[in-house]
């Protein structure tokens, strides 16, 4: 019933509003998000903010992903991340650094992600596996902060639905939306923004702009 109600929100045109679902008995207070657009240059210098997407194409080394399958078909999908020292140096009094996902806590009271003792932060990490007939078929994943689920879904659909082999699905140009508030501080949103790799054909880009 809930899914049927939510499906009515889907149309040919993207809404520029943030419209989270409301499940009876699980209503939560939503924080106020900045929808003036993403831009974390000054925050990146401090080691916070979205860690992966740069218009300059520069990388500084953070999240990685690895998949391993042995001869018996056992699979491991892992996305190590969360401890890059530029986001939190070692705290002398404690002897360890804070996980970079601590950015996803809120200091405002009464929110689902309000900082509290014993609470775990949410995470963008999504190492994944696909099953076929109940058996492991594919281990996959990617770095990418908030883009991980988006890029992985595109990759999987290109392979399973589009008929691409794994290398073709990886190499094909990708895209993602910045419509929703980012997980990393300062948690800005860019309503209606779609980011495409420059390798897309100009005709496709023009059609999307229209």
Model segments located where?
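Alpha-helical support elements that line or immediately flank enzyme active sites
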Residues: 142-168
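Mature, solvent-exposed C-terminal subdomains and processed small-chain segments of exported/organellar
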Residues: 1, 74, 163-167, 171-210
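M16 family metallopeptidases and their MPP-like homologs
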Residues: 125-128, 134-149, 172, 188
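Hydrophobic alpha-helical scaffolding
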Residues: 55, 59-62, 115, 119, ...
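Internal maturation/activation junctions in enzymes
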Residues: 1-81, 91-94, 184, 206
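Acidic, glycine-rich active-site loops and adjacent beta-strand->loop/helix elements
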Residues: 82-83, 101-104, 144-146, 174-176, ...
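Short, solvent-exposed loop/turn segments at the edges of secondary structure
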Residues: 61, 91-93, 120-126, 147, ...
């Amino acid at each position: 019933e809930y899914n049927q109600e939510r499906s009515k929100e889907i149309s040919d045109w993207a809404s520029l509003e943030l419209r989270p679902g409301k499940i009876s008995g699980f209503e939560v207070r939503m924080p106020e998000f900045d929808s003036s657009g993403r831009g974390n240059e000054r925050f990146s210098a401090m080691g916070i903010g979205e860690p992966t997407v740069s218009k300059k194409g520069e990388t500084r080394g953070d999240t990685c992903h690895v998949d391993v399958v042995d001869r018996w078909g056992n699979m491991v999908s892992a996305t190590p991340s969360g401890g890059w020292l530029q986001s939190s140096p070692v705290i002398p009094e404690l002897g360890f650094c804070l996980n970079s996902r601590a950015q996803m806590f809120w200091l405002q009271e009464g929110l689902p992600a309000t900082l509290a003792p014993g609470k775990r932060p949410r995470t963008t990490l999504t190492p994944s596996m696909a099953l076929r007939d109940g058996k492991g078929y594919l281990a996959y994943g990617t770095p990418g902060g908030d883009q991980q689920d988006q890029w992985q879904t595109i990759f999987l659909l290109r392979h399973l639905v589009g008929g691409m082999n794994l290398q073709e699905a990886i190499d094909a140009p990708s895209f993602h939306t910045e419509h929703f508030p980012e997980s990393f501080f300062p948690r800005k949103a860019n309503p209606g923004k779609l980011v495409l790799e420059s390798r897309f054909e100009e005709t496709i880009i023009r059609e999307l702009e229209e």
